[in-house]
């Protein structure tokens, strides 16, 4: 069985994603307003960094959950996670 998110982790991730969603809406508005490229790019990079932190939180949770699995099952889950991470 693949690791799943508990209530607390789910809420933390959803909160982070909602903030990122707001950042992206703000970037869209900046583009519509024809704001300077450096200002837009700064916000794009901030949103990207926030999204990368969400990914890191997911990976950390996955590893923590795998530690509680039987070794062979944990290995399969971790191998799959590495495949997904290196695919990008």
Question: Where are the regions that the model predicts?
Answer:
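Solvent-exposed interaction patches of small proteins and small membrane subunits
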Residues: 1-88
């Amino acid at each position: 069985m693949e690791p799943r998110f508990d209530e607390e982790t789910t809420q933390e991730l959803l909160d982070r994603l909602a903030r990122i969603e707001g950042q992206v809406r703000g970037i869209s508005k900046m583009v519509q307003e024809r704001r300077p490229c450096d200002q837009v790019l700064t916000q794009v990079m901030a949103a990207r960094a926030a999204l990368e932190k969400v990914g890191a939180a997911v990976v950390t949770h996955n590893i923590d959950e795998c530690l509680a699995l039987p070794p062979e099952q944990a290995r399969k889950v971790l191998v799959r996670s590495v495949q997904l991470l290196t695919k990008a």
